[in-house]
């Protein structure tokens, strides 16, 4: 009964982690599409000067939504990554392969780099569409488009990080899982009969 409850509890935890992973990757995808929509909204505003567009309120709002989704997905990626490590550590499944460990660390590093880079690009696009700008400057008209593509890249890197972490630890867990034998399957060990000890007491 206790083993069944423990297995059911572990299954529920793994299911929750999988749902959170899907939501995290989904937030990255939503951020990418919103960034592309912000780029499309910015293209509709009229030119004030050459290669310089007027601020777009729609692009400004969509940019805020995109960077919010990216930030939420980034925080969730790190929290879920730590949860996966803690879960398999509790189950006694920590991979001893250094290559797998280095690969996971590289993916985590890429998640931070891509997340920060995407947030900075989207923030630049948001700033370029603020109504409080004193003058229109020469800016890149494809900022939101680049930011949206970076959000898609963040989703891909996060997915690779999750899959590599789960597969490596689950494989190690199955290899190191002890084989439990039932008491009925245990065979008695045959014992050799003890030799008769010589009688040390003299006969009367």
From Swiss-Prot:
The answer to keyword Signal applying to this record is: yes
Report the InterPro entries cross-referenced here. Answer: DEAL/Modifying_wall_lignin1/2, DESIGUAL
Under the cellular component aspect of Gene Ontology, which terms does the record hold? endoplasmic reticulum membrane
Q: Which UniProt keywords apply?
A: Developmental protein, Endoplasmic reticulum, Glycoprotein, Membrane, Signal, Transmembrane, Transmembrane helix
User: In which tissues does this protein get expressed?
Assistant: Only expressed in inflorescences.
- Lineage, top-rank taxon, reads Eukaryota
Q: Which residues are glycosylated?
A: 179
| TM region(s), chain numbering | 13-33, 60-80, 107-127, 143-163
Q: Cite the residue spans of the region called Disordered.
A: 177-204
Bilayer topology reads: Multi-pass membrane protein
Instruction: Give the subcellular location.
Output: Endoplasmic reticulum membrane
Q: Which PANTHER family match?
A: OS07G0462200 PROTEIN-RELATED
Which family does the record assign? Answer: Belongs to the DESIGUAL family.
Query: What is the designated name of this protein?
Result: Protein DESIGUAL 4
Gene designation per UniProt:
DEAL4
